[in-house]
């Protein structure tokens, strides 16, 4: 059976240069990041503005309205100033997840360094804007209203720890789900290949694993969208905390 972890290896494509004796290379991960951005740009810029939209234009409009409605629901109208930021994250995660389902491709969201970079980008955006807009009133985020003074120090400590751990939970959730899903797919696909190589008996034995691979692929399609949605809605919730820290 082929190593199910091999699909996550980062391989250099060509060397860009050296900094401090360290090789700086353009990798397969970098290539698929560029691909995700290129596909998103093609979808959003390559579609027309026809009165009767085609398939690509419909997908672009649905994506736009979906993210816009999510922001309005969680962060209000004021949160719409973050629409370009949130929409970019949503499309990057969605497209990279979908591309990763295609056999022999690379899933950038299955690497913790990528999801952590996105999570910390959200975290510092919220932190900087929260202090920029509210000043010291941003600390109200850590003091829930109606809390008795006796337990206030404990609650504040818990809230601060919870806030600081956001990038960890935000990134690990996406990374772990994509990693586990792709490993499972690889394992069952390997079973199909091995049984099929055993001849007529193996072909019949491969029917069940093949059916499971098809079912798991369909499930991974759902997970690809679901994880992008979860990552996006958490981003919107955190942005709402920066806009309305006292709520």
UniProtKB/Swiss-Prot annotation:
The organism of origin for this protein: Nitrobacter winogradskyi (strain ATCC 25391 / DSM 10237 / CIP 104748 / NCIMB 11846 / Nb-255)
Entries under Pfam families matching the protein: ATP-synt_A
PANTHER family reported in the protein's UniProt record: ATP SYNTHASE SUBUNIT A (PTHR11410:SF0)
Signal peptide interval: none
SUPFAM superfamilies, per database record: F1F0 ATP synthase subunit A
Keyword annotations of the record: ATP synthesis, Cell inner membrane, Cell membrane, CF(0), Hydrogen ion transport, Ion transport, Membrane, Transmembrane, Transmembrane helix, Transport
One Gene Ontology term, aspect cellular component: proton-transporting ATP synthase complex
Record's protein name: ATP synthase subunit a
Function, in words: Key component of the proton channel; it plays a direct role in the translocation of protons across the membrane.
CDD domains according to UniProt: ATP-synt_Fo_a_6
């Amino acid at each position: 059976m082929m190593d199910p972890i091999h699909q996550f290896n980062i391989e250099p494509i060509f060397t860009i240069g050296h900094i401090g004796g360290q090789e700086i290379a353009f990798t397969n991960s970098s290539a698929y990041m560029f691909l995700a951005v290129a596909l998103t740009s093609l979808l959003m810029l390559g579609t027309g503005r026809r009165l009767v939209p085609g398939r690509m234009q419909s997908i672009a409009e649905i994506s736009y309205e979906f993210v816009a409605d999510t922001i309005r629901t969680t962060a209000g109208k004021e949160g719409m100033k973050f629409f370009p930021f949130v929409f970019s994250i949503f499309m990057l995660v969605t497209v990279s997840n979908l591309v990763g389902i295609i056999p022999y491709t690379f899933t950038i969201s299955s690497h913790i360094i990528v999801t952590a970079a996105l999570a910390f980008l959200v975290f510092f955006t919220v932190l900087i804007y929260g202090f920029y807009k509210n000043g010291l009133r941003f600390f109200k985020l850590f003091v829930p209203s109606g809390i008795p003074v006796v337990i206030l120090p404990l609650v504040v400590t818990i809230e601060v720890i919870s806030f600081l751990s956001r990038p960890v939970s935000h990134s690990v959730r996406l990374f772990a789900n994509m990693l586990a899903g792709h490993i499972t797919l690889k394992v069952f696909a390997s079973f199909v290949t091995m049984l099929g190589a055993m001849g007529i008996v193996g072909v019949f034995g491969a029917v069940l694993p093949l059916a499971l691979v098809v079912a798991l692929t369909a499930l991974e399609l759902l997970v690809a969208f679901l994880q992008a949605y979860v990552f996006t809605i958490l981003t919107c919730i955190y942005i709402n905390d920066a806009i309305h820290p006292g709520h």
